């Protein structure tokens, strides 16, 4: 579309001339590029990404964690961002909006720990830890990768599942913000996710997990 072409041109100018973020925003205003993003999952109080997008003159439509996405919500949208969304996006929505990018922000270093409770499983199975941003397809957390980053934790003997979750949460927000221009202008290289890795369902969580405030080292020692 002309909107996406304009965004791509602006991104190219930014890259060539090293335009700073303030000038980037002004160029968008001058060219009157209307950008609308549908944000699924966390609300404005739970994540800073919605406020960030609005600061870039993006019109943000939101849909809560437990609400079901419908076809009409994707009209005139340039991007759908899923972060903390509780539902699998049905194939008829993806097919209806096949020219539209759907991306998911996932708290694991894909392809490891697809599905539920990725932070817990990364410790329980001693698999790579990190965050990923990937395109959404019909399979759970198996769309092509856009970005991923490994994360290491300091003072692990003092960490809980909740504290490490919070670290990953902030890292994922930072990864999105840092690469925002690439994402919105589609200036990214897709990487196919390996068939290896791991996948877990909610029901797979051990009953020994009472709450997420449990110390990781102590839990692993006793389980």
Go through the PLM ranges and name each one:
Residues 1-223:
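One-carbon transfer enzymes
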């Amino acid at each position: 579309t002309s909107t996406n072409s304009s965004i791509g041109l602006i991104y190219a100018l930014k890259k060539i001339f090293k335009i700073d973020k303030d000038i980037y925003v002004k160029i968008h205003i001058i060219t009157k590029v209307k950008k609308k993003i549908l944000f699924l999952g966390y609300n404005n109080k739970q994540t800073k990404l919605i406020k960030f997008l609005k600061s870039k003159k993006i019109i943000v439509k939101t849909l809560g964690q437990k609400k079901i996405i419908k076809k009409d919500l994707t009209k005139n949208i340039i991007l759908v961002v899923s972060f903390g969304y509780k539902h699998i996006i049905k194939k008829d929505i993806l097919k209806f909006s096949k020219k539209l990018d759907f991306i998911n922000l996932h708290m694991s270093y894909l392809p490891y720990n697809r599905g539920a409770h990725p932070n817990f499983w990364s410790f329980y199975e001693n698999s790579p830890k990190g965050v990923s941003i990937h395109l959404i397809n019909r399979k759970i957390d198996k769309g092509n990768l856009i970005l991923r980053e490994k994360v290491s934790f300091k003072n692990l003997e003092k960490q809980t599942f909740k504290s490490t979750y919070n670290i990953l949460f902030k890292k994922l927000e930072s990864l999105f913000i840092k690469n925002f221009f690439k994402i919105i202008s589609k200036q990214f290289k897709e990487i196919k996710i390996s068939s290896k890795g791991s996948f877990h369902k909610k029901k797979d969580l051990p009953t020994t997990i009472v709450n997420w405030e449990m110390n990781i080292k102590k839990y692993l020692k006793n389980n």
